[in-house]
Amino acid sequence: MSLVVLTNIPTPYRTAFFDALAEEAARAGRRFHVLYCAKTEPGRHWPYVASKMRHAHTVLRGFHPSLTGIHAHLNPGVLAELNLLKPDTLILAGSWNTPTMLVAGLNIYSPPPRRFFWSEGHADAVLHKSGLIAWLRRRVYRTFDGFAVPNAKSAEWAVAQAGSPRQVVTLPNAIDAKFFARPSAASRQEARRHLGLEGEGRVLVQVSALTARKGVLELANAFLGLSAAERRGAKLLLVGEGDLRSQLETLAVGSDGAVRVLGQLPPEEVRRVLWAADAFVLNTRLDPNPLSAIEAAAAGLPVVLSAAAGNVREVVEVPQTGFVIRDAADPSEALRAVLNASEVQLAEMGARSAELARTQFDAPAVARSLVKQLYP
């Protein structure tokens, strides 16, 4: 008996989780295999290094057309691969309308596998709430036996789209908590020295695509709109790449060093920036389940997260690990809150963040939970 995941491309956070899931599946006496539609997609900057992946996997041959920013995958051999693997459980991860995902729904062997859709969408993040696309989405959702979801918002959304009760398993985005955990108090100062931040005020960081969807311009403008007395020498670091980078760099040039655009960084450098920071910010306008906030929590940072994020309740509100941005168009109130918080308050929030990441989002814990839910 085996568990198979069909997903679009290998990403660092997914491959680390799949490595952990392979180990947990083996302990439960289950084979585990991942089918990838492609090695990468436009705009994705992670290299594919098969030697670093400890889970059995296959990169399918196929066609990968792009249209108006949508990257589709058509892998004609997916059914043949599934016929060879014959999973008892198949998890489909990615866009519901990807041609390969739709083809994988055809039952070519008996008994067919249980089919779960790994759904991170929710009502606040969906682009098409009505019309033809919404109708097609509901039709596809009704074909699934169940859903793997990261949070309560996504669970409610998926079942509503299906139109009737389905099995729901909890599958939050998993991280390597040990990788991001700050090893010592001295590491913060070392990271600050490396980034030229010695002796500065508080350091806030947002790690995201530099796009309108992530609210980066609104964040930078709101930060610069605070008075000098409110900022008290604070710095805002922006890590990532996107079509708004040039506008952000123009703001940074005129900010007298208050805003810095660091661009796309490898995971080790992102970690160093998190270690140097006092708090993490994500001013997203539309985000089903942002992983960067969880990685920041693992680094022991207070999290300032937009209410539009699907996991805001699980990551910030319930565990009280930071502050909520109620309106991504103007995050000033939340910025003032984190800048006015005492060192003791920030330390307490950071400690709760680290504990949350370790117990709820660390890859081995998430993998163990998923296997138990699928095979009780």
Model-derived features: positions:
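Donor nucleotide-sugar binding/catalytic pocket of nucleotide-sugar-dependent glycosyltransferases
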Residues: 138-188
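A short, histidine- and acid-enriched strand-loop-helix "catalytic/donor-clamping" loop
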Residues: 95-99, 113-131, 143-146
